[in-house]
Regions:
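Oxyanion-binding/catalytic loops of NTP- or PPi-dependent enzymes
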Residues: 1-75, 79-85, 104-336
Length: 336
């Protein structure tokens, strides 16, 4: 029948895994990383780049690259790259094809079957687009699995004889998904789900970049239009600084000069407190989906047995603290 792989097709990063017995194992990509950036680019020679190489190109040639296209799945939005038009499912197919190649290199044989995760709130069109992306990539999609169900399984909430109500709080790079999952008699069922397709860690990064640029006299929107190389370099540094500020209290960002030269630029020091103040208005947008998901499941927060954190943005202390405040309990931390 052939090996079935599991794919997390994410907004900012994707991953591929398989079951070794009953234990899931991540398959490393060509650069020996666990995550493949969900970025597609076309270089000057017309070669399609995917993952880390595309992300590197995006820093210096943002006009030749695209990311966050998961937000457009199921729509008719087209993206022009290298003079060609691509639908969202075609862009996703490039990422899936790259993950498929990594799996084939690992197993040393063809891989044609996959299970792909999607947000629980994805509608029928978005799910069909995901299946279509798999087909374009040469994969038979055996099943579309809701991300909160996959997360609950990963945290071990599937024991026979246990009955629990689990809230899965998934704040990734580009999307926010909150779901109530009921565990009963060894099965898992999503009782309710809500979220935002345009809310995630990328929004925190761009907000940080805007404040850093403003601090040196460059309004963000004007800089995006006139100095795209400067903006892309600052965004790249802000992404790294955001991760650093989850562990440390300060981070330094260097704003390049108009030519993109970092050495000739200015240094800006950002504190964790500043970052948290900047992103708090954005983080407030999680509250309405949380209220809605509890109301749809006809539950109060006191009826939630466990809270599970999923997605890279939940590594930020400000996010963990807000979840703790919302539910009055310590959430399960992010799994590697």
């Amino acid at each position: 029948m052939g090996k079935i792989i599991g794919i997390d097709l994410g907004t900012t990063n994707s991953a591929v895994a398989y079951l070794s017995g009953l234990q899931p194992e991540i398959i490393l990509n060509a650069p020996s990383g666990r995550l493949t950036p969900s970025v597609v680019g076309i270089d000057e020679g017309g070669t399609v780049l995917v993952g880390a190489t595309a992300r590197e190109l995006q820093v210096v040639r943002p006009d030749r690259c695209v990311s966050l296209f998961k937000r457009w799945m199921g729509s008719d939005r087209a993206t022009i790259l290298g003079g060609k038009s691509f639908a969202p499912e075609e862009l996703s197919a490039f990422v899936l094809r790259s993950l498929k190649a990594d799996a084939e290199a690992y197993f040393q044989k063809p891989v044609t079957r996959a299970v792909i995760t999607v947000p629980a709130y994805f509608n029928d069109q978005q799910r069909k687009a995901t299946v279509a992306a798999g087909r374009i990539a040469g994969l038979t999609v055996e099943r579309i699995l809701n991300e909160p169900t996959a997360a609950a399984i990963a945290y071990g909430f599937q024991g026979v004889g246990e009955n629990k109500i689990v809230l899965v709080f998934d704040l990734g790079g580009g999307t926010f998904d909150v779901s109530v999952v009921e565990q009963f008699d060894g099965t898992l069922e999503v009782r309710s789900s809500a979220g935002e397709t345009s809310l995630g860690g990328e929004d925190f990064t761009r907000t940080m970049a805007a404040r850093v640029l403003e601090s040196v006299g460059l309004p963000f929107e004007r800089a995006e239009a006139t100095l795209p190389l400067v903006v892309s370099r600052v965004v790249q540094q802000c992404e790294r600084a955001k991760c650093q500020l989850s562990r440390e209290l300060t981070a330094t960002i260097r704003v390049p000069d108009a030519t993109g030269d970092l050495a000739a630029g200015k240094e800006v020091v950002v504190t964790r407190g500043q970052l948290e103040a900047w992103v708090t208005p954005i983080l407030a947008r999680i509250e309405q989906p949380v209220r809605r998901v509890l109301a749809d499941a006809r539950l109060t927060r006191e009826k939630i047995d466990e809270v599970v954190l999923v997605g890279g943005a939940t590594r930020m202390p400000v996010v963990v603290n807000r979840v703790r405040e919302l539910f009055g309990r310590e959430p399960h931390g992010l799994l590697d």
